[in-house]
Structures are given as structure tokens and as C-alpha cells.
Amino acid sequence: MKKIIFAVLMLATTITAFAGDNKEKKSENNKPSKEIKKMGPIHLTKAEFLAKVANYEKNPTEWKYLGDKPCIIDFYASWCGPCKTIAPILEDLAKEYDGQIYIYKVNTEEEQELAGAFGIRSIPTLLFCPMGEAPQMAQGAMPKSSFVQAINEVLLKKPKAAVKN
């Protein structure tokens, strides 16, 4: 008798739990989303790089940036400790500077030909691509303040007095 009562109580509890869970999901789906999803870093393949950043195969002797906004390109590897250190910084910067710059990521393990074309020998290597100018390269992990300074001065061309530290 005790086993039957226990089984009935467990069944009732399970049904109640699933019924309550389902109502929450329905109400969440019916609510309009007020949260605006901000852009994060964009992972590039070689083909995407050639279309969005620079077609070095078509113009091997001249740098011609194809983007409509300045960008940072992070050449990284998934096993690299310093790469993992700057990944959340780049994620934050992509949100902070959304609409002003692009932040691209190129996995050097998967895109070896692309990394070789730029002579990437150590990672992370960062390529800062301003509009209408030659890109600038930096190697190694940097603190967020250095990224902010480079973005403001190199990419967005803000004078030092206008840059907040």
C-alpha cells in the first residue's frame, strides 16, 4: 500500500513539475525580446578574408582594405594561452565599439595558408586595419587599455585629448 501511495505522489509531482516548466517556456516565447544582441568577434575563413578584408591574391603588391569600417584581425590558435587571455577582451571591445569597427578572428591552425600569407610566426598576432592606410601589426597579448588606445588612435583617428583612459 505504501508503495502505491508513493508512486502516485511521485507521478503527481512529476506531472506538476513538467506542466509548470511548459508554461514558463510559453510565456518566454510570447514576450517580445527587448534585448538587442550585440555583435561579437567574427571568425573568418580564407575565402571570407579575401572578400571582406583584402584580396591579396588579386592585389599581391598593394594593400587594399575592402571593409566599410576599420578592423582588428586576431590571428590565434585554440591551444594558445595568451590568445585565450585576450579573447574576452576582444569580445568586450566588439560590443563596446559595435558599429564603429569590426573585430575578426582567424584560426591559424585551420587557415594555415592565410596565416602564412601574412608571415604569422607567433600568436596572438593582431593586425589593425585603418581606413585608407596601411595596416599595423602587433604581437603578443595586450591589456584592454592598449587595445582601447590603438582603436581610438590608429583605427578611429581620435586625438589623444579626446581619448578617455
Ranges and model annotations:
Residues 68-71, 75-79, 122:
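Short pre-active-site segment immediately N-terminal to redox-active cysteine/selenocysteine motifs
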Residues 1-50, 159-165:
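N-terminal targeting signals for export/organelle localization
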